[in-house]
Structures are given as structure tokens and as C-alpha cells.
């Protein structure tokens, strides 16, 4: 497997990202909606929006969406989709301070991104900064247990047949929880979700992970 810089990896993945059999994405989409709740009329930030799969859904539901990603190729795919004109897209490196106003969002989402973030403390502080006092920060990430299976974000490049992995970081669950604590974010919900028969019926790749935790979800609220 070829490990490449994270941005370069997602630039290469963008063209076919939405077409790949990705059981983690399917599992996440099953659970993130109920956790998000009704977003009608809310200001929503999608940090690490990729090809816009969530941003478009929330915009269609009536949210005012700002979507941020560092991959121009991913953003190009997102902007080309139906409904994208209603979304404000921002290209920005997530390792740096986000160019968004403080306390401007009712929901701050960060979906399947954290394993590519080296410095969690400063990143969690940024997520909290964006969130309104009575808002929520909602995070999804590949469950750390997947590392025991030797799994990390990866794809097979159709043109070359090579297995490519954008560079990632092996964080533990405690790393995420303690980063939230240090950012003064309170844990309202934590969910661990495993592959099941329903997922395997939709995604052949999920079959080898039946019963194994694949997804971690956190719902956080600013302290005080």
C-alpha cells in the first residue's frame, strides 16, 4: 500500500469517492441523521465536507450551510452537485485556524476527518469556538478498534490498480474524549456502531467486519 500526503490522497480519490463501496460511510449515514436532529433554519458548519454528501443533505433540509475542506478536487465535486448553490464552500487547511466567525453555528459537524488531524487539542478548540452556546458539535470517526484490523482510510486507484492510503494518525478513543474535555466540550452522547447483516447486504466489504466496532459518534455541547 502506498501512503501519500493526506491532501494529495483525497485529490486523487475525489473523482470516484462517491462511487466506491465504503461500508463506513454507509454505516455513518444510518446514524448521523438522528443524532443531528432537525436542522431546518439552523446555521450549520460542515468541517471536512469532502464531496458534500452531508452538506447537500442539510441544505436541502433548510439549513444555512458553510462547508470547509482542504481538497480542491473534493470541493469541485461538491460544487457540481444539484443544490450546491445554496452552500457556502470554503477551501482551507483544517490544521490551521478556521476562517469562520466565533459562535456562529448551531451545529458544527466533523465527519470522518479526525484520523487525519495530528493535533487534536487545537482542532477541538476550533470546533468549540465556532459553536453557539446552546449548539452542538457532532463528530464521526472511524472507530479506533479498526486499527486492530489493520484498517485505515484507503482506496484502489482505478487507473493504476494501486492501493492508496492518505496519511492518517492512530488516535485512541481516550484521545478524542480528552481533547473534548480540554476544549470545554461536554459529552452528551457517545455511540459505538458495529457492522451488521443489514450493512453487509448493502456493502460486500462490510462482511468481514461483522460485529466489530467500525464507527464512533460523539455529540458534544459547549460548557457553560
Task: Locate each region found by the language model.
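A short SAM/SAH-binding and catalytic strip from SAM-dependent methyltransferases
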Residues: 107-119
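A short glycine-rich, Lys/Arg-flanked "PGG" loop and its adjoining helix->strand segment in the class I
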Residues: 121-136
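Class I SAM-dependent methyltransferase SAM/SAH-binding core
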Residues: 45-96
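Conserved class I S-adenosyl-L-methionine
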Residues: 1-39, 53, 57, 74-77, 136-163, 167, ...
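A short acidic, Gly/Pro-enriched loop at the edge of an enzyme's catalytic core
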Residues: 98-107
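Short alpha-helix
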Residues: 168-191
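Conserved Class I S-adenosyl-L-methionine
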Residues: 186-224
Amino acid at each position: 500500500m502506498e501512503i501519500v500526503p493526506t491532501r494529495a490522497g483525497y485529490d486523487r480519490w475525489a473523482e470516484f469517492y462517491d462511487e466506491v463501496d465504503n461500508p463506513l460511510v454507509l454505516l455513518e449515514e444510518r446514524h448521523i441523521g438522528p443524532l443531528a436532529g432537525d436542522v431546518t433554519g439552523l446555521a450549520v458548519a460542515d468541517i471536512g465536507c469532502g464531496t458534500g454528501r452531508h452538506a447537500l443533505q442539510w441544505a436541502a433540509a433548510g439549513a444555512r450551510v458553510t462547508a470547509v475542506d482542504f481538497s480542491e478536487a473534493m470541493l469541485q465535486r461538491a460544487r457540481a452537485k444539484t443544490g450546491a448553490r445554496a452552500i457556502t464552500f470554503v477551501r482551507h487547511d483544517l490544521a490551521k485556524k478556521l476562517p469562520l466567525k466565533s459562535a456562529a453555528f448551531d451545529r458544527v459537524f466533523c465527519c470522518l476527518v479526525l484520523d487525519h488531524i495530528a493535533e487534536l487539542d487545537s482542532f477541538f478548540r476550533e470546533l468549540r469556538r465556532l459553536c453557539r452556546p446552546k449548539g452542538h458539535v457532532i463528530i464521526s470517526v472511524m472507530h479506533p478498534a479498526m486499527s486492530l484490523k489493520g484498517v485505515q482510510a484507503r482506496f484502489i486507484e482505478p487507473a493504476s490498480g494501486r492501493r492508496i492510503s492518505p496519511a492518517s494518525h492512530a488516535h485512541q478513543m481516550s484521545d478524542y474524549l480528552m481533547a473534548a474535555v480540554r476544549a470545554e466540550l461536554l459529552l452528551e452522547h457517545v455511540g459505538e456502531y458495529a457492522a451488521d447483516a443489514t450493512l453487509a447486504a448493502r456493502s460486500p466489504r462490510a462482511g468481514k467486519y461483522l460485529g466489530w466496532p467500525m464507527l464512533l459518534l460523539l455529540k458534544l455541547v459547549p460548557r457553560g
